[in-house]
Amino acid sequence: RAKLTALREQGGSPFPNDFRPQHSAAELQAGFGEETKAALEELGKVVSIAGRVIRNRGAFIVVQDSSGTIQLYVTKEARPFAKSLDLGDIVGITGALHLSGKGDLYVQMDQYQLLTKALRPLPDKFHGLADQEMRYRQRYVDLIVNPDVRNTFRIRSKVVDFIRRYLNAADYLEVETPMLQVILG
């Protein structure tokens, strides 16, 4: 909350709504993942992506959007901004697409904007949410940090949607029934 207050005092909006991402992580990986370093340099593709910070390690930040993850390269100008980020913050980045020495795609942080400040930072990747009780009580955190749980919910949602469409096509009527009510009947 202190960082949020400091951001407000500097005149910045902690929750701007003017950034429009043009690409997703999966789209970039699928479209440019097989390119060579030289081909990407020659292409000079500028991309715009938004995502949640899940790792922040010096020169590289890893962000996750709804489709996957991608690395961001922290330029010299972006270092103060990168140091102010916490795990869970959502950022918008515009910059050139490159290939690292290890063959991973990354976006150079030419333009950057904080879209949402995380009031409660996420657990780090190595420790995560190990306590089962905590995972159930903080389901939203579990969905953010655990891809297997997120995938389970995606599959469940698709199954429920399929059943609902099938029954609607057969002219069934959906009726909500209270299940967690204190008053019986």
Residue map of PLM features:
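Class II aminoacyl-tRNA synthetase catalytic cores and aaRS-like
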Residues: 1-185
